[in-house]
């Protein structure tokens, strides 16, 4: 008989709990606050069957568009044929975690705000654009003596007489 195509087909390893992370769910999982617009990673917890998203969304990053008592609405991109569609799914909080994808952006934004405030106090205008890293500066190699290398003439006749 052919293999089944159920909702949880081929998820034996995908939904398995990590080593030494089996057992009870920590309370911090339920005490996290999610706000609309936050980026979250969908990471299915195989121990909790309620509110579990489809296996396609496991490992995807999305943006929260709705917050309810026990779940959050996540908007995830999904490629269907030749187009990308934004899918809206509701997932329980046990199956999502805060994403670190915008961490660097938020840090850079804070640094730019400080730089802009300092520049405004001095009465200057600055550019906060990121610039590509330029070439390394040149340097001189010290303490080296030059040696001229000349090739040895290749003698075909003697090479054939000597054999291998």
Curated annotation (Swiss-Prot):
InterPro entries tied to this protein: Ribosomal_eL21 (IPR001147), Ribosomal_eL21_CS (IPR018259), Ribosomal_eL21_sf (IPR036948), Translation_prot_SH3-like_sf (IPR008991)
Pfam families: Ribosomal_L21e (PF01157)
SUPFAM superfamilies for this protein: Translation proteins SH3-like domain
Name listed for the protein in its UniProt record: Large ribosomal subunit protein eL21x/eL21w
Ribosomal protein recorded as keyword: yes
CC annotations in GO: cytosolic large ribosomal subunit; nucleus
Entry keywords, A to Z: Ribonucleoprotein, Ribosomal protein
Entry's Gene Ontology molecular function annotations: structural constituent of ribosome
Protein family per UniProt: Belongs to the eukaryotic ribosomal protein eL21 family.
Domain of life (superkingdom): Eukaryota
Gene Ontology biological-process entries: translation
Keyword Ribosomal protein part of the UniProt annotation: yes
């Amino acid at each position: 008989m052919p293999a089944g195509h159920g909702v949880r087909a081929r998820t034996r390893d995908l939904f398995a709990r990590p080593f030494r992370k089996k057992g009870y769910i920590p309370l911090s999982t339920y005490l996290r606050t999610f706000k609309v617009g936050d980026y979250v990673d969908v990471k299915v917890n195989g121990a909790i069957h309620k509110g579990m998203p489809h296996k396609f969304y496991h490992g995807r990053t999305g943006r929260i568009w709705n917050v309810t008592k026990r779940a959050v609405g996540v908007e995830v991109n999904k490629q269907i044929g030749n187009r990308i569609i934004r899918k809206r799914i509701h997932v329980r909080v046990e199956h999502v975690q805060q994403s670190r994808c915008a961490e660097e952006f938020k840090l850079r934004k804070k640094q730019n705000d400080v730089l802009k405030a300092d520049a405004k106090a001095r009465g200057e205008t600055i550019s906060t654009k990121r610039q590509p890293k330029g070439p390394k500066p040149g340097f001189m190699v010290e303490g080296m003596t030059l040696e001229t290398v000349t090739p040895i003439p290749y003698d075909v006749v003697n090479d054939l007489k000597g054999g291998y």
